[in-house]
């Protein structure tokens, strides 16, 4: 089963890269998220999931579905953090704010049917110091999906 998933992932990655090289290769990322959740279950690691940089929420959604698929315990909270304003840095060669802003309201609506999901709007360096994030006791899976160094260094 794992082999077939890997083959499908590689084939889809190849197709996506050859259609448009600028398209992010999410299939490999999603495969790794599945693997991490399986290891968390196997090793019985307690704690919440926290994702830094959710953009439109695709990875967060995939992570929730992966955890549910393998019946991860239901008392975990899935935290999603993003500024929803693009990047805090203006000068970057590749990443432009107009390509990376997303709608906080749309993301909130997308996850409204998941009571275990908490979406936090703001910059990481500020939000990590405040409640409710400062009250997190244990994290089993931290996914840092930042596109620039300045943001990831705050995590």
Q: Model-predicted segments: where are they?
A:
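S-adenosylmethionine/decaboxylated-SAM
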Residues: 3-24, 43-155
């Amino acid at each position: 089963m794992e082999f077939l998933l890997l083959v499908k992932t590689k084939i889809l990655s190849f197709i996506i890269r050859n259609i448009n090289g600028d398209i992010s290769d999410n299939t490999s990322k999603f495969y790794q998220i599945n693997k991490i959740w399986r290891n968390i279950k196997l090793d019985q690691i307690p704690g919440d999931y926290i994702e830094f940089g959710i953009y439109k929420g695709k990875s967060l959604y995939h992570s929730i579905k992966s955890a549910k698929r393998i019946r991860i315990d239901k008392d975990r909270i899935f935290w999603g953090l993003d500024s929803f304003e693009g990047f805090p840095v203006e000068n970057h060669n590749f990443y432009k704010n107009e390509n990376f802003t997303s709608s906080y309201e749309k993301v909130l609506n997308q996850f409204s049917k998941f009571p275990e999901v908490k979406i936090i709007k703001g910059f990481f360096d500020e939000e990590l110091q405040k409640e409710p994030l400062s009250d997190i006791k244990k994290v089993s899976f931290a996914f840092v999906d930042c596109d620039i160094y300045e943001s990831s260094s705050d995590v």
